[in-house]
Amino acid sequence: MTYGGRDQQYNKTNYNSRGGDFRGGRNSDRNSYNDRPQGGNYRGGFGGRSNYNQPQELIKPNWDEELPKLPTFEKNFYVEHESVRDRSDSEIAQFRKENEMTISGHDIPKPITTFDEAGFPDYVLNEVKAEGFDKPTGIQCQGWPMALSGRDMVGIAATGSGKTLSYCLPGIVHINAQPLLAPGDGPIVLVLAPTRELAVQIQTECSKFGHSSRIRNTCVYGGVPKSQQIRDLSRGSEIVIATPGRLIDMLEIGKTNLKRVTYLVLDEADRMLDMGFEPQIRKIVDQIRPDRQTLMWSATWPKEVKQLAADYLNDPIQVQVGSLELSASHNITQIVEVVSDFEKRDRLNKYLETASQDNEYKTLIFASTKRMCDDITKYLREDGWPALAIHGDKDQRERDWVLQEFRNGRSPIMVATDVAARGIDVKGINYVINYDMPGNIEDYVHRIGRTGRAGATGTAISFFTEQNKGLGAKLISIMREANQNIPPELLKYDRRSYGGGHPRYGGGRGGRGGYGRRGGYGGGRGGYGGNRQRDGGWGNRGRSNY
């Protein structure tokens, strides 16, 4: 989604006038960009344009030589609200304690507690209030003053905590303070994300809140043809949201450059490193002027992310909401059933029957492989359930369609792999079902975090088999921390009680009358389709070959 030329400009002198002309008489600044010769002496940044369509290896500029040639830019826009200024240190400490907020660094601005205290110009504030938000989230209360002050920062918060707006809104203010884009300029704000789904989600927020400023944005990701993305980049966009691999492709063929980037965001940095993007991230960041503002966001704080921050952030300040210890939201009810593989389908049906009692239910089912995703989806659809699958072998158009069907509730059951589900933010997911357990406890917490978001409650069901015994102790620890009921069958895998006996799998759950009555999975649900007739014949929705 792109917009026309931006006609609002911000400067420091009229910041508190709210809603005035934000151009601020910066014509000389704009001309300094328009009159500047295009091109330069390094590829991907100011690089030369020979062999424009042929990939050219990105070369790190000599910033000691290049930086003095670049125009200066504004990045500190924060004006502390008088209500914030008048709060005592003890009040601030109490607020941070109540919000489980930990800070580090020096000269950290005080947190705000309302949208008005954030000091956003009217064109931003009006967009926020139009969305009907009651108050800022914890990470926004501290993150906005940090980001608006122009400091490099690290934000550590769980998915669904409001972190996207924590960097998106200050980014919009940052853009409106800079000279307008000239033909051939790249973005002012660059957001790197691990997956196309998260990138599209970020673009939606940027479009929504940048609309009044006519700020254009482009989303650049793999899995689709480059042609449309190239056209969008050529028209000029103040914000580019990108996955690392596709952005490097665009830089190497000269379809964009990073010479105007002064606000860099690394979103879900831990996931990007988990997915092996560190070399690409480093290659990209090396192309950006070192006096930029950099914001790094992560759900966890492992040593690899710490090292990346140490290498690329300058004297950063840090805010963390919640514990650094891996934990699950206490809004989620965790149910673990110790089963054998052949019991999983019957258990799945049981929980879907429970979930479907809610007319607006959404259930996300995780499987370990693409093939298993398709197998589960095929089985469920044959059994009358409105299920669709999403995984890496499906093209982007089909993935987008599946996500849309899931979001609007026409297909309230989605089966996904971990990779396909990363970055997906769908409101109203009531149930997460781990048909196959993930390979590590971090992915378990990430999976079940798809429900119970933004203060809502949710339920996570996991089918634990003997093959998952390596996860047992850590899973029990996560459940204990969240005060969950731990089934006796699972305690076999607890280091604190290892070696103890355990009841037979599934004993005492009952209610199914035994597996024999099903007459085999193919025909045991003969009357089920009649119960789904209200769905308009889900088997004939025109996507029967999905």
From Swiss-Prot:
Chief location bin: cytoplasm
Residue ranges of coiled coil: none
Bias kind Basic and acidic residues: ranges: 20-33
Locations listed in the record: Cytoplasm; Nucleus
Biological process according to GO: nuclear-transcribed mRNA catabolic process, nonsense-mediated decay; rRNA processing
Covalent crosslink: Glycyl lysine isopeptide (Lys-Gly) (interchain with G-Cter in ubiquitin): K474
InterPro entries with a match to the protein in the record: DEAD/DEAH_box_helicase_dom, Helicase_ATP-bd, Helicase_C-like, P-loop_NTPase, RNA-helicase_DEAD-box_CS, RNA_helicase_DEAD_Q_motif
Alphabetized UniProt keyword annotations: ATP-binding, Cytoplasm, Helicase, Hydrolase, Isopeptide bond, Nonsense-mediated mRNA decay, Nucleotide-binding, Nucleus, Phosphoprotein, Ribosome biogenesis, RNA-binding, rRNA processing, Ubl conjugation
UniProt entry tagged with the keyword rRNA processing: yes
E.C. code: 3.6.4.13
Biased amino acid composition, Gly residues: 498-540
Disulphide bonds in the chain: none
Alphabetized Gene3D superfamilies for the sequence: P-loop containing nucleotide triphosphate hydrolases
Segments forming domain Helicase ATP-binding: 144-319
Family: Belongs to the DEAD box helicase family. DDX5/DBP2 subfamily.
Biological function: ATP-dependent RNA helicase involved nonsense-mediated mRNA decay and ribosome biogenesis through rRNA processing.
Domain comment in the entry: The Q motif is unique to and characteristic of the DEAD box family of RNA helicases and controls ATP binding and hydrolysis.
Name used for this protein in its record: ATP-dependent RNA helicase DBP2
Gene assigned in the entry: DBP2
